[in-house]
A protein has these predicted regions:
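C-terminal scaffold of the Radical SAM
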Residues: 1-287
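Auxiliary N-terminal substrate/complex-recognition segments of SAM-dependent methyltransferases
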Residues: 2, 294-298, 321
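Basic amphipathic alpha-helical segments that dock to polyanions
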Residues: 278, 294-303
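A short, conserved structural fragment
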Residues: 301-311
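Minor-groove-contacting beta-hairpin "wing" of winged helix-turn-helix DNA-binding domains
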Residues: 312-316
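Short, amphipathic alpha-helical interaction segments positioned at domain boundaries
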Residues: 318-331
Length: 331
């Protein structure tokens, strides 16, 4: 706890942190105690995100998780006792061997806890993982697209009927508890990450810190560079020696990069994108920028997967099922 508190104190020393700032702590069930969480809550952490994934022990075993469902319930109770009144639970569906009834039971148990925020994701079986090896060896069959979509929509229906607002493809929240830092990403606002592998987006520049020991060397070299250089421009200094060590990726967006990111990130939200906001940000009308792709956009509007009016563009609930295909138009 002390190291996390030191990080938070350092941020407060160097930045203006508002009294109502959302400060999220991520954890896993069974990994924290009430005393530990109380110390962090007292220090200023006010939102907790917990990787439950499921309330089925069989599903947790399939996923290779070391906790069990009772650990999730106990950790949630500990968080409430520690003072956290803004808690997110991560859940996963389309796990091999877990049918719609198992998923519904997880949703029901989640609702009994009544967290403020829910993130729900479809399992993607990635290569070079134990699950992929089991799949390739015929231990289980991949969940069908039809079953996957049924579980997704049952989650949305269940959450809406319980007072949650479905505000992003994979996220729902009680009114006023939308995840602020995720909304920053989806609205293309600036953010900064510290430490190895951390990613940032500032003034149209995307960069990711290195993962190896070179990062520390790069930070020290950057300090010396800034002492002896007049430039404070990130792009101008990206060719400096320190940048080769500090960053694993460094990309300067051009106009279309930024416009496209604004659109496909904005379409993740159920509210979609605003044409007025687009024009204010880019000085051009959305219709003019994407006039050459109108023939790709129009079929999705006609099919009801995309909804366009005078205010903006958004995905329909059915459109969320093929969101990757639609967003690919703008990449």
């Amino acid at each position: 706890a002390e190291s996390l508190i030191e990080v938070l104190d350092a941020i407060r020393d160097f930045f203006d942190v508002t009294d109502d700032c959302e400060i999220t702590l991520e954890t896993n069930p069974g990994a924290v105690s009430e005393a530990y969480l109380s110390k962090l809550h007292d220090a200023g952490f006010n939102r907790l995100s917990m990787g439950c994934q499921s309330f089925s022990d069989d599903v947790l075993k399939t996923l290779g998780r070391i906790h069990r469902s009772k650990d999730a319930r106990e950790s949630f109770a500990a968080a409430r006792a520690a003072g956290f009144d803004n808690i997110n639970l991560d859940l996963m569906f389309s796990v091999p061997g877990a049918d719609e009834d198992v998923w519904q039971d997880t949703l029901d148990q989640m609702l009994e806890l009544s967290p403020e925020h829910i993130s729900f994701y479809s399992l993607q079986i990635e290569e070079e993982t134990p699950l992929y090896d089991m799949y390739k060896n015929g231990v289980f069959a991949e969940v069908t697209d039809e079953a996957d979509r049924k579980m997704y929509h049952s989650a949305i229906e269940c959450l809406k009927s319980s007072g949650y607002e479905h505000y992003e493809i994979s996220n729902a929240a009680k009114p006023g508890f939308e995840c602020r830092h995720n909304l920053k990403y989806w609205s293309l606002s600036d953010y900064i990450g510290f430490g190895k592998s951390a990613s940032s987006y500032i003034d149209g520049v995307r960069f990711t810190n290195a993962t190896d020991e070179g990062y520390g060397k790069g930070v020290l070299m950057e300090r010396d560079f800034l002492k002896n250089s007049k430039t404070r421009n990130m792009i101008e200094s990206s060719d400096a020696e320190f940048a080769k060590y500090k960053y694993s990726e460094f990309h300067v967006n051009d106009f279309m990069d930024t416009a496209s990111e604004f659109v496909f990130l904005g379409l993740r939200r159920t509210a979609g994108i605003s044409f007025d906001e687009f024009e204010q940000l880019f000085g051009k009308r959305f219709a003019d920028v994407y006039s050459g792709r109108r023939n790709e956009i129009e079929p999705f509007i006609e099919s009801g997967d995309l909804i366009e009016d005078e205010n903006g563009l958004r995905l329909s609930e059915r459109g969320f099922d093929i969101s990757n295909k639609i967003m690919a138009i703008f990449v």
